[in-house]
């Protein structure tokens, strides 16, 4: 469960290292975001000499949360960290590599480019 002011790791090589959620895209007063939700975030830490800079406002999709994800078949998945992938306005990832495992639910939400770049889909 990601809410405003939550810090997230970045799971791609776009140049950002850490994000802070400032808004959840969707309804006007939604409190929590889960895997597959798009957020507006600010970059808190970035790699030197990268196209993305600190304090830049970007869009990202959540790929891992430490809160449990319950599937319809009864399986529960929990990750060690909260992580997101930086995306552009069309929903394509800005990076060319994805680090770590991501959830299968992203494929159902039409983030197929992110799923194809991921090394492991759970």
Curated annotation (Swiss-Prot):
Predominant location category: plastid
Annotated compartments: Plastid, Chloroplast
GO CC terms in record: chloroplast; cytosolic large ribosomal subunit
Keywords annotated in UniProt: Chloroplast, Plastid, Ribonucleoprotein, Ribosomal protein, RNA-binding, rRNA-binding
Pfam families: Ribosomal_L14
InterPro entries according to UniProt: Ribosomal_uL14 (IPR000218), Ribosomal_uL14_bac-type (IPR005745), Ribosomal_uL14_CS (IPR019972), Ribosomal_uL14_sf (IPR036853)
GO MF terms held by the record: large ribosomal subunit rRNA binding; structural constituent of ribosome
Domain of life where this protein originates: Eukaryota
GO BP of this protein: translation
Quaternary structure and interacting proteins, as annotated: Part of the 50S ribosomal subunit.
Role this protein plays: Binds to 23S rRNA.
Similarity comment text for this entry: Belongs to the universal ribosomal protein uL14 family.
Name the UniProt record assigns to this protein: Large ribosomal subunit protein uL14c
């Amino acid at each position: 469960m990601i809410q405003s002011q939550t810090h997230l790791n970045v799971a791609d090589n776009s140049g950002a290292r850490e994000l802070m959620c400032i808004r959840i895209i969707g309804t006007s007063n939604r409190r929590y975001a889960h895997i597959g939700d798009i957020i507006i975030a600010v970059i808190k830490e970035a790699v030197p000499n990268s196209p993305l800079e600190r304090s830049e406002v970007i869009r990202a999709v959540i790929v891992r949360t430490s809160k449990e994800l319950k599937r319809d078949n009864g399986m529960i998945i929990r990750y060690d960290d909260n992580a997101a992938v930086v995306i552009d306005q069309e929903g394509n990832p800005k990076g060319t590599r994805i680090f770590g495992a991501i959830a299968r639910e992203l494929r159902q939400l039409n983030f197929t480019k992110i799923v194809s770049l991921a090394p492991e889909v759970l």
